[in-house]
Amino acid sequence: MLRKIILGASLIMAMTLSAQSQCKKGDCPHHSWMESNVWNNGWNVAAHSSINAKEFHEQYEKNREVWDAMFAYLAKIDLDTLSLGRIDIVPGRCYIKMSEYVPRESEKVNIEQHHNWIDLQYTLRGNEKMGYAKDVTVKHEYNPKKDVAHFNSDNVTYFKAGPEAFYLFFPTDYHQPSVIDGEPVTSRKLVCKIEYIH
């Protein structure tokens, strides 16, 4: 119990520091770095403007070989024809998973958070949106085996998901992926899991 309290307090502190340390787009070296695409290794898909550019930049620099391997792999394959399922890029440190599904209404989709993995989510086709939640309350406690905790919130900001940009969700991001946004059609989405360097 004490361990959970300490872990929770540490995470809240990290989230507060992360929010305080974000700089404004336009005068921020991290945003400039993200928009320069020097990190993409030939994968020409934009990073969505909602991404925490400071966290992205710092994680990339701490774990460059893994990020480079992932982006290089994404640049050389055809994501439209890639088989469904999981592929290890750097065993134990990065893998990708292609899936197809019909998104659901927000009330039926969990708000989630991970401690040890970063999510890159890229919707190739479908009518869906991604949510960032604030003012959350715990729905399901953190499960270390699945690296996920679930939350409730009435304060969620949504962004359209599509082939023009990918999203990154860090441990400081309470996110609600795969929410329906229009007609219920089948989505095709890539999720990349990248180890988070604490």
Where do the PLM segments sit?
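Conserved metal-binding segment of the jelly-roll/cupin
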Residues: 160-179
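His/acidic/aromatic-lined binding-pocket segments of jelly-roll/cupin-type domains
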Residues: 118-122, 158-159, 166-167
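A short, N-terminal "cap"/entry segment at the start of jelly-roll beta-barrel domains
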Residues: 28-98, 108
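Bacterial Sec-dependent N-terminal signal peptides
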Residues: 1-28
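A short beta-strand-loop-beta hairpin characteristic of the jelly-roll/cupin
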Residues: 127-161
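Short, conserved beta-strand element in jelly-roll/cupin
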Residues: 116-128, 144-146, 193
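A short hydrophobic beta-strand segment most commonly corresponding to one strand
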Residues: 166-168, 184-198
